[in-house]
Amino acid sequence: MSAIRYELIKTDKQTGARLGKIHTPHGTFDTPMFMPVGTLATVKTMSPEELKAMGAGIILSNTYHLWLRPGEELIREAGGLHKFMNWDQPILTDSGGFQVFSLSKMRDIKEEGVHFRNHLNGDKLFLSPEKAIQIQNALGSDIMMSFDECPPYPASHEYMKKSVERTSRWAERGLKAHERPEDQGLFGIVQGGAYEDLRAQSAKDLVSLDFPGYSIGGLSVGEPKDVMNRVLEHTTPLLPANKPRYLMGVGSPDSLIDGVIRGVDMFDCVLPTRIARNGTCMTSSGRLVIKNAKFTHDFRPIDENCDCYTCKNYSRAYIRHLIRCEETFGIRLTTYHNLHFLLNLMKQVRSAIMEDRLADFREEFFEQYGFNRPDAKNF
C-alpha cells in the first residue's frame, strides 16, 4: 500500500480546479497548498510552532544540502528528519537534482549519474538516482522526489529529448532502489521544457511506472508566464486524476492562482523567504519594498488587510529601520508576513473552489494586486 493517498473533495465549476486532501504517514494536509522551504531543515528565522500557527500543512527540505551538512546518517541517527527538526507534520524532500545543475558549474552528466563539484569546498561528488533515493530514505521524509536532469532554458528539442529519456530511465532506477515505499511516497518528475510533445512523452513514461504522485519540473526557470501556463494546460490532463500534482519552484501569487486553475495541488518556492531578507513584502495591493525612504515615517502595518503577527504589532517605519540596520528581527518579521500572506492566499483559493468562484476570485485578486496594470510589478 502506498504511503501517500490523494482525496478529491470538490472540483470548481468555473475552472476545474481541485480541492482535496493528501494523506501521509505524518498526517493530512489540505490542497491546493503552498509549502514553505526549509532548505537546511529550518525555514529561515521561523520556528515550527510559528509555521503551524500560520497554516503550513507541509514543509520542504533539501536533499542535496542535508547530504553535505550535516549528512544523512546523522539525521538517521537522530530518528529521521521529523525528530531532528522537531516537526511532526508532513515533510517533502527534493532529489538534489536541481541543486546539482544550478549550483555546480563543473558537472559531467553520465548515464550512471552526475559527477560534480561541492559548491562549498570544491570536492568531487557523485549523485545517482539510487544515491538520491538512499539519502531520502535515511532522511525519512513523507514525500520523496526522483532524481531528474534539470536542463537549462532554453534548450534545443534534440537536447531536451535526450534529457527526458534519461530522466525516465533514472526514475525507473530510483523506483527500484526505494526501500521504504510503505513509509515514503516517491513522486516522478515530468520534464520536457516548453516542448509539448516531450512533456507528453515524459508524462506517459512516468505514468506507466505508477508513482503515487507526480511533479512538474523545469518550469519557473526563466520562461515567460504564458509559456508556463501553456505547458501546464497541456501537461496536467496527462497525469492521473486520483494522484497529487506538484508544480516545483513556483511561489509568486499570480502563478499560484494560475497553477491551481490548471489542476495543480502543491507548490513550493524560496521566493517569500528570500525576498523577505532584503525587505520586499507581498501585500494585498502589490509588492512593497520596505527600505524605500517613503516609509521612514509610515506607522501603518505592512498590509492593512493582513492579520498576521507582524501586521498586528509592528509598523512599516519600525521594520524599515530594522532591515536597514540588518537586524535579524526585521527579517523575522518580513519572513513571517510573506509566508502568512501566501498561506492565507491558498486558504482563500480553497474557499473559492468550495464556492465555485475561483475565476471570479482570480479577477478580483489580480485587480487589487495590480497584475492587470501595464506597469505591474511582479517578483
UniProtKB/Swiss-Prot annotation:
Pathway field: tRNA modification; tRNA-queuosine biosynthesis
Region annotation RNA binding: where it falls in the sequence: 249-255, 273-277
GO CC entries: cytosol
GO annotation terms (biological process): queuosine biosynthetic process; tRNA wobble guanine modification; tRNA-guanine transglycosylation
Residues forming the catalytic site: 94, 268
Record's keyword terms, sorted: Glycosyltransferase, Metal-binding, Queuosine biosynthesis, Transferase, tRNA processing, Zinc
GO MF entry, a single one: tRNA-guanosine(34) queuine transglycosylase activity
Cofactors demanded by this protein: Zn(2+)
Binding site for Zn(2+): 306, 308, 311, 337
Binding residue positions for substrate: 94-98, 148, 191, 218
Record's catalysed reaction(s): 7-aminomethyl-7-carbaguanine + guanosine(34) in tRNA = 7-aminomethyl-7-carbaguanosine(34) in tRNA + guanine
Gene3D superfamilies, sorted: Queuine tRNA-ribosyltransferase-like
Cofactor stoichiometry and binding remark: Binds 1 zinc ion per subunit.
Enzyme class: transferase
UniProt-listed Enzyme Commission number(s): 2.4.2.29
Family assignment from sequence similarity: Belongs to the queuine tRNA-ribosyltransferase family.
Cross-referenced PANTHER family: QUEUINE TRNA-RIBOSYLTRANSFERASE
Record function comment: Catalyzes the base-exchange of a guanine (G) residue with the queuine precursor 7-aminomethyl-7-deazaguanine (PreQ1) at position 34 (anticodon wobble position) in tRNAs with GU(N) anticodons (tRNA-Asp, -Asn, -His and -Tyr). Catalysis occurs through a double-displacement mechanism. The nucleophile active site attacks the C1' of nucleotide 34 to detach the guanine base from the RNA, forming a covalent enzyme-RNA intermediate. The proton acceptor active site deprotonates the incoming PreQ1, allowing a nucleophilic attack on the C1' of the ribose to form the product.
Subunit-structure text: Homodimer. Within each dimer, one monomer is responsible for RNA recognition and catalysis, while the other monomer binds to the replacement base PreQ1.
Protein name: Queuine tRNA-ribosyltransferase
Native source organism of the sequence: Listeria innocua serovar 6a (strain ATCC BAA-680 / CLIP 11262)
